[in-house]
């Protein structure tokens, strides 16, 4: 399968979006530029936080573009959270807490409110009407860009520690150390064959 990377996905290289500053103290540093990382960063920035995403790849959302055969199965439209979680073996306790905070309806409303219509297919699977994962990525990158989230790509994190004196996080990459009040690890999981 060929994956097309849109100009939006490469826009983190733009000077106003990409950062090389290492001496700033960030409110939030998010490790991982996948969907969870971008949602976390966008939500934090919406609340007025100064946010940095550290991404190991050159572009954000790289694995997102191949999910669902390149179509991106956003969610499962089973209205009852407990029923939906039957489809996720072994992780239901953790996921129940997460889905109780941001439900399937919240997910659908979020994308609809950002101009991305969805459709439901067999088994309650929900996809963008465009049948393109790129549509999902464009929404997420558009939000973090609008909220002035900064991104440092090609920056795999090598260590995270807490300074005992200041209580601040020290997040190290190969080339720099970033300091933050909060650190969110949103590195995602391994890809699986469909």
Each language-model region and where it sits:
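Extreme N-terminal leader/targeting segments of oxidoreductases
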Residues: 7-28, 46-48
């Amino acid at each position: 399968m060929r994956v097309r990377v849109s100009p939006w996905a490469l826009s983190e290289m733009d000077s106003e979006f990409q950062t090389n500053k290492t001496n700033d103290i960030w409110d939030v540093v998010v490790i991982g530029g996948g969907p969870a990382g971008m949602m976390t960063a966008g939500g934090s920035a919406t609340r007025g936080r100064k946010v940095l995403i550290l991404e190991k790849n050159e572009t954000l959302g790289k694995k997102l573009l191949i999910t669902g055969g390149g179509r991106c199965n956003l969610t499962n439209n089973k209205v009852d959270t407990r029923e939906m979680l039957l489809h996720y073996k072994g992780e239901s306790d953790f996921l129940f807490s997460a889905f109780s905070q941001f439900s399937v309806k919240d997910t659908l409303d979020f994308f609809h409110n950002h101009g991305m219509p969805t459709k439901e297919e067999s088994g309650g699977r929900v996809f963008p009407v465009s049948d393109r994962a790129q549509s999902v990525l464009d929404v997420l990158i558009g939000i973090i860009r609008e909220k002035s989230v900064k991104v440092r790509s090609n920056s795999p994190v090598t260590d995270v520690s807490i300074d005992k004196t200041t209580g601040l996080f020290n997040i190290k990459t190969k080339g720099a150390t970033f300091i933050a009040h909060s650190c969110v690890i949103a590195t995602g999981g391994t890809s699986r064959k469909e």
